[in-house]
C-alpha cells in the first residue's frame, strides 16, 4: 500500500469510527439512563413495601375521617369538630403527611428522590460528553437544545443563575421536583436529569441531531430536496407509478376501497367465520381462527418417501457440494480486493462458516496436518475474508441459484416474504443488546430480524438490540435486500403496526400484511361519509383526511423517493415521523394515506379465507426456518457471545447463509427424488409437492466430528446416489 492510499485509508478510518463512536456514546447514555430509571423505580417500590404498614394505618385514619364527614348531618356541630372527635387533628395531619410521602401520582414512572442521589455519577462524565458532542436542533427541538446549552454553560454555577434555566416542555411531574413552589428556585440536580431524559428522547425523534452522525444525524439533509429532487422526480414517479397530481393518484384508490367494502358486505352472509358482536355496548368484529390444514395420506406417504431417499451427509460436505454447484464461496474476497486465490480456500471458508453458524468456535475444526484447517490460517482468513459484504454477496448467489430450481418455483414465485425475529440471549456485556424478561429473563439479548421468501430462502436480516419495536425495522429490511427475488407483499406475525407503516409501504408499492390476533380492535376507514356499506356502517365511521394527503402529497413522494434510492434510513425516518405516538404533520398525512391500504387489507383479510390461509402458511415457513436455524446454532447453549454489532451481524449472517445452503441442497436432492419416483411410474399430485419443505435436517450431521473431503464421484457436480428402499418405492 503506497503512502497516498495509506493516508486515505487512515482518514477514512478516523472519520467513520468517529461517527460510530458518537452513535455508540448516545446508545450507552440511553442504556444507562433507562437502566438507572428502572433501578431507582424498583428500589423505591421495595421501600414502599417496607413502609406499607405505615401507609395502611394512615389510609385507615383518613378513611375514618372521610366517613365521618360524609355521614355528618348534625347542623349544630361543625364538620371539622366531628372529624377531629373521631380522629385527632394531630393524627390526621400526620396521616396526610405519610400518604403524601409514600404515594405518587398514577402516571409517575420515575423515582425522583432515589434518582437524584446519582447526580454525582452523572457529573463525572457529563461535562466531557457535552464538550465532545455537537448537538443541533430542528424547530421542534429548540427548547430542548436551549436546556442542554444552559446546563453546559452553568452546570457548576451558583443557585442564583439556575433561576434563569429554560423550562419550556417541563411536564407536571417533573415540575414538582425541578421547581420549588415557594421560592421558585430550580433544583439543578433534578433539572439535569430532566434535561438528559428530554435530550435522549429528542435524539430518537431526530428533533435533536448530531452533526456528522449516521444514526442520530439530520434526516432533513438526507432527504431529496431542491434541484436534486426536481431532477430525479420524473424517474421516481415512473418507478413508483404515482402522479404528481394527488387527486389523480387518489382516484383509483377510492374506487378500490369502495369496491372492497361492497365485496365484503355482499359476501357477509356466506362468510360464517366473521361475526359482529357487542362488547360493553360497542360493536366489534370477531373472526373465527383458521383450523389446522390436515395432511392427506398421500402427502404423508410422499414426505416419508422423500425423507428416506435423501443421502446422509456431514454439514461440511453439504457446504462444499453446494459450492460446487453455485460457487458461492468465490464471493469471499480478500479485504484488499487482491484477485489472487490461496489453495483450498473453500475448505477454510467452510470451516469458518461452521464455526460461526454452529456457534462452536474454531477449536473443534482445527486439524493438525491439514494446512487448510490450521488455526493460524483460519484466523487470518476470518480477519481478511469474512465481513458483511462478502456474506451478503454469497447469500445472494445462493438465493438466485435456488430461485431457478423447478421445485422452488412450485413453492412460490418470490413475490411474497414473511418477516419475524429470532431471539438470542447474550451473556457478554454489550451496548448492542437489550432487556426483555419474556425472552431473556433478567439478562439481555438481541433479535435477528429476517425475511423468509415463499421459496424458503432467507433474503436479509438485521440485528436489533433486545426486542424493541420489531416493526420499525421492517421497511429497512425490505429496502436493503438485493437478491433476484423482489417480494411485493410482506407478511408479519401479530405485532405492533401503525398507519404510517401502512402508508410508507403503500407509497413504495408494497403490500404490508400483518396477521391479526384481535381484528376487533382494528378500525375501518372510509372516504365518503354518505356511502352505504350496510352491516359495516357502524364500524366504519372514521373518515380519511384527504385534505392532509393533498397538502403534503409532494413531500410524501419526496420521502418515498428518498427511501427507494436509499438516501435515508427507513427505521430512523419512521421514528422521526411517529414521534412516540405524536406524529408530525407529514407523519399524519402519511398515516391518513396508510388508512386506505390498512382498511383495504382488513376487508380482504375478513372476506377471503384463502388469503388468511396464505398468510398463515407463509408465517409457518418462517417459523420452521427459525427451528432449523436453532438446530444449527447449537453450540454454547445457543447463546450469542458477540459483544459488538459487527460481530453479531457477521455471525448471524453466517448462520443465515448456512441455513440457505441446507435449503439449496435439500431442494435439489428432493427434485432428484421426485424425478426418480416419476420415472418409476408414480403419479405425483402437484398440490402435495407444493406442501413439501426443504427445511428437514434429520439426514444432516450437524453435531460432532466433521469430514471436509468430497467423494470423487461428485467433485464434478454430479449428485450423490439416493438411499431408497425398493419395497417403499414400489408401493
Question: Model regions: which residues?
Answer:
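Long amphipathic alpha-helical coiled-coil/heptad-repeat bundle
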Residues: 1-255
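Structured, charged N-terminal subsegments at the starts of enzyme catalytic cores
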Residues: 258-368
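Short coil/turn segments at secondary-structure boundaries
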Residues: 333-337, 366-367, 394-397, 412-416
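Histidine-/acidic-rich catalytic cores in large beta-rich domains
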Residues: 350, 414, 443-445
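Catalytic or ion-translocation cores adjacent to nucleophile or general acid/base/metal-coordination motifs
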Residues: 368-406, 436-554
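Structured nucleic-acid-interacting core domains from mobile-element enzymes and related host factors
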Residues: 398-434
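A glycine-rich phosphate-binding loop feature that marks nucleotide/adenosyl-phosphate handling sites
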Residues: 420-422, 494-497, 520-522, 573-581
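Long, compositionally biased intrinsically disordered regions
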Residues: 531, 538-731
Amino acid at each position: 500500500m503506497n503512502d497516498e492510499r495509506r493516508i486515505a485509508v487512515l482518514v477514512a478510518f478516523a472519520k467513520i469510527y468517529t461517527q460510530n463512536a458518537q452513535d455508540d456514546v448516545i446508545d450507552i447514555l440511553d442504556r444507562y439512563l433507562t437502566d438507572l430509571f428502572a433501578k431507582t423505580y424498583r428500589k423505591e417500590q421495595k421501600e414502599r413495601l417496607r413502609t406499607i404498614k405505615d401507609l395502611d394505618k394512615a389510609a385507615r385514619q383518613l378513611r375514618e375521617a372521610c366517613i365521618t364527614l360524609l355521614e355528618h348531618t348534625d347542623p349544630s356541630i361543625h364538620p371539622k369538630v366531628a372529624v377531629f372527635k373521631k380522629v385527632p387533628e394531630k393524627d390526621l395531619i400526620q396521616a396526610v403527611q405519610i400518604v403524601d410521602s409514600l404515594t405518587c401520582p398514577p402516571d409517575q414512572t420515575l423515582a425522583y428522590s432515589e434518582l437524584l442521589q446519582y447526580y454525582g455519577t452523572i457529573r463525572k462524565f457529563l461535562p466531557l460528553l457535552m464538550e465532545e458532542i455537537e448537538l443541533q436542533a430542528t424547530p421542534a427541538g429548540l427548547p430542548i437544545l436551549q436546556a442542554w446549552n444552559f446546563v453546559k454553560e452553568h452546570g457548576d454555577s451558583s443557585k442564583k443563575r439556575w433561576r434563569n434555566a429554560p423550562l419550556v416542555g417541563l411536564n407536571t411531574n417533573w415540575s414538582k421536583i425541578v421547581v420549588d413552589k415557594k421560592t421558585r428556585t430550580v433544583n439543578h440536580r433534578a433539572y439535569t436529569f430532566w434535561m438528559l431524559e428530554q435530550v435522549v428522547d429528542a435524539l430518537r425523534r431526530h428533533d435533536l441531531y448530531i452533526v456528522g452522525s449516521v444514526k442520530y444525524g439530520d434526516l432533513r439533509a438526507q432527504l431529496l430536496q431542491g434541484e436534486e429532487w426536481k431532477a430525479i422526480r420524473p424517474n421516481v414517479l415512473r418507478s413508483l407509478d404515482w402522479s404528481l397530481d394527488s387527486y389523480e393518484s387518489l382516484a383509483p384508490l377510492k374506487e378500490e376501497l369502495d369496491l372492497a367494502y361492497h365485496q365484503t358486505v355482499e359476501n357477509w352472509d356466506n362468510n360464517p367465520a366473521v361475526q359482529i358482536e357487542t362488547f360493553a355496548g360497542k360493536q366489534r368484529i370477531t373472526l373465527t381462527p383458521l383450523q389446522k390444514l390436515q395432511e392427506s395420506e398421500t402427502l404423508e406417504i410422499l414426505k416419508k418417501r422423500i425423507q428416506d431417499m435423501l443421502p446422509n451427509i456431514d454439514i461440511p460436505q453439504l457446504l462444499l457440494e453446494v459450492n460446487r454447484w453455485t460457487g458461492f464461496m468465490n464471493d469471499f474476497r480478500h479485504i484488499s480486493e487482491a484477485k489472487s486465490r490461496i489453495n483450498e480456500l473453500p475448505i477454510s471458508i467452510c470451516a469458518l462458516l461452521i464455526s460461526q453458524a454452529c456457534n462452536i468456535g474454531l477449536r473443534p475444526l482445527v486439524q493438525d496436518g491439514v494446512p487448510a484447517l490450521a488455526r493460524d490460517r483460519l484466523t487470518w482468513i476470518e480477519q481478511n475474508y469474512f465481513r458483511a459484504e462478502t456474506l451478503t454477496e454469497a447469500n445472494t448467489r445462493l438465493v438466485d441459484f435456488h430461485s431457478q430450481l423447478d421445485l422452488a418455483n412450485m413453492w412460490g414465485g418470490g413475490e411474497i416474504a414473511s418477516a419475524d425475529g429470532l431471539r438470542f440471549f447474550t451473556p457478554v456485556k454489550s451496548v448492542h443488546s437489550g432487556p426483555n424478561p419474556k425472552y431473556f429473563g433478567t439478562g439481555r439479548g438481541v433479535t435477528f430480524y429476517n425475511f423468509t421468501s415463499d421459496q424458503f430462502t432467507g433474503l436479509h436480516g438485521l440485528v436489533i438490540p433486545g426486542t424493541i419495536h420489531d416493526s420499525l425495522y421492517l421497511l429497512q429490511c425490505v429496502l436493503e435486500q438485493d437478491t433476484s427475488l423482489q417480494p411485493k407483499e410482506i407478511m408479519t406475525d401479530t405485532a405492533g403496526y401503525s398507519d404510517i407503516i401502512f402508508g410508507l409501504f403503500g407509497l413504495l408499492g408494497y403490500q404490508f400484511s400483518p396477521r391479526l390476533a384481535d381484528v376487533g380492535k382494528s378500525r375501518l376507514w372510509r372516504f365518503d361519509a354518505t356511502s352505504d356499506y350496510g352491516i359495516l356502517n357502524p364500524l366504519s365511521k372514521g373518515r380519511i383526511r384527504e385534505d392532509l394527503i393533498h397538502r403534503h402529497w409532494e413531500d410524501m413522494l419526496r420521502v418515498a423517493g428518498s427511501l427507494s434510492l436509499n438516501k435515508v434510513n427507513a427505521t430512523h425516518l419512521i421514528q422521526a415521523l411517529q414521534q412516540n405516538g405524536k406524529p408530525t404533520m407529514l407523519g399524519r398525512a402519511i398515516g391518513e394515506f396508510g388508512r386506505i391500504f390498512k382498511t383495504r387489507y382488513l376487508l380482504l383479510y375478513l372476506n377471503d379465507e384463502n388469503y388468511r390461509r396464505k398468510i398463515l402458511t407463509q408465517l409457518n415457513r418462517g417459523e420452521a426456518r427459525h427451528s432449523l436455524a436453532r438446530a444449527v446454532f447449537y453450540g454454547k447453549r445457543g447463546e450469542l457471545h458477540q459483544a459488538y454489532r459487527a460481530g453479531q451481524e457477521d455471525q448471524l449472517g453466517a448462520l443465515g447463509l448456512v441455513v440457505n445452503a441446507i435449503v439449496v441442497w435439500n431442494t435439489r436432492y428432493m427434485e432428484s427424488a421426485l424425478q426418480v419416483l416419476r420415472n418409476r411410474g408414480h403419479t405425483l399430485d402437484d398440490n402435495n409437492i407444493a406442501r413439501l419443505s426443504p427445511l428437514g435436517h434429520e439426514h444432516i450431521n450437524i453435531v460432532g466430528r466433521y469430514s471436509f473431503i468430497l467423494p470423487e464421484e461428485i467433485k464434478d457436480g454430479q449428485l450423490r446416489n439416493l438411499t431408497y428402499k425398493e419395497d417403499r418405492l414400489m408401493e
